[in-house]
Amino acid sequence: MTDTAARALLRRQLEAHLCSLGYSCVHARRLAPPVPEIARVSPVRGRVAYGETVLRRDLQRRRCHERLLNLSQRRTRRRSTILLFIAVAERDRRDLEALLERLNIQNGIRGGHVHLVTVAPAAAAARTKL
């Protein structure tokens, strides 16, 4: 699968996951760079959630590291945390967890607002056939 197809698949799965959690409204406010791939708002609670997709190649890139670090540290005007959902292929989950720990984004104490959405290869193959 090409990087473009893999990223599109991860993005679709992530958007479906966010919608299932109630984050259905597109966040329309102008965002500071780097702009997240997905920005949604819960219409009930008004809580903001960002979404990013990470491929195996991205795990080695400094730009990806800086992007994840920046998005994980963002706060609302009222200083509350913004949820960050990261879509990753199942085989790359452990590498991403190690990266998040190394960057001090998510460990035993910090990073409760960062959630990993794992996309299984079987689900990926079934979705592309539809």
Model-derived features with residue positions:
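Flexible, charged surface loops at secondary-structure boundaries
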Residues: C19, S42-V48, T76-S80
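A short helix-loop-beta-strand connector motif used in the catalytic cores of GNAT acetyltransferases and
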Residues: P33-P36, I82
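Hydrophobic beta-strand segments of well-ordered beta-sheets in folded domains
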Residues: R47-G51, S80-V88, V114
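Structural motif
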Residues: R29-L31, E52-D58, A87-R91
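Acidic-basic catalytic patches of nuclease active cores, encompassing PD-(D/E)XK
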Residues: M1-P34
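Conserved catalytic cores of phosphodiester-cleaving nucleases, focusing on short active-site segments
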Residues: P36-S72
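Short, charged, amphipathic alpha-helix that recurs within catalytic cores of restriction-modification
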Residues: R61-V88, D92-I105
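Domain-level recognition of nuclease-like catalytic cores that cleave nucleotide substrates
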Residues: E90-L130
